[in-house]
Amino acid sequence: MKYYMIAGEASGDLHGSNLIKEVKKLDAQCEVRCWGGDLMEQAGGRLVKHYKDLAFMGFIEVVRNLRTILTNLKFCREDILAFQPDALILIDYPGFNLRIAKWAKKNGFKVIFYISPVILTLKKSLSPAPIP
């Protein structure tokens, strides 16, 4: 199977790396493409973007980096389309992952929130698929 994982901060990188290790125990031939960090890469994921290139905190910093954020969203969508994963696994990182989830769901990709953002309780249309 092919998995695409997105984690946007250090804690997500840790959780993502543990998930990659467990998935690889069950399916040694699986492919994992990811946005995350060094831990996810060391666990066997093919790192596309490092979370250090994605972290913008605060209103002013987000506004200053809006072009970069929009470019990252576009690149992520294109990369998912090119990779055609069996499942898209999102690890927290709500500002980015909720936008990707909405797009992915509309485009027929299976979306799994491994650690879902708290805001999901308010967004019924983005209800996460449970992990079996």
Regions found by a protein language model. Name each.
Residues 1:
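Nucleotide-sugar donor-binding and catalytic loop/hinge architecture
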Residues 4-132:
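Active-site and donor-binding regions of nucleotide-sugar-utilizing enzymes
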